[in-house]
């Protein structure tokens, strides 16, 4: 708090006890979950008959949804942009207002809620268009690969989030507000992509409302 010793607070014992309690409760929850839920182990993989759909662990299914549209942008381009953007936030955000507080800075909680609504609406709209109408490859089979790589649901979604963040920075005249908006959109988008990849993708990575709708082999 501040820069001088008179405006500081000791980490011991209050912060240390709080962090230790959270760590112990998290560990206890993970252990209880591991005991209560069995791992979904299947038969030994057969390289001659690959699984369809072959899905990554659930925490990678958001990325797999992006990779389904473009291997390069989904697997390398967009993750690199996200990591670089998150890494730059501490260097770009030099504001002191709201430091150390949840939803601190201009906008506060209303900004987070508005950003969450935009983030959810954007990813749902982009995915709905891709599922209902297809994308460039379906519209134009002879389209060059560079166009498929540059313009796909993942890049469109990234652009929408970036433009919303820039608009937020200008509206609130605050880099922190833009960073908060961008991070909120990223979390909402990744959550929706993970849910879609987990529950609504079937054979050949086609969209199905339920596994009961999958074609019979």
PLM features: what roles do these ranges have?
Residues 1-4, 10-99, 103-136, 144-217:
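Hydrophobic cores of alpha-helical transmembrane segments in multi-pass integral membrane proteins
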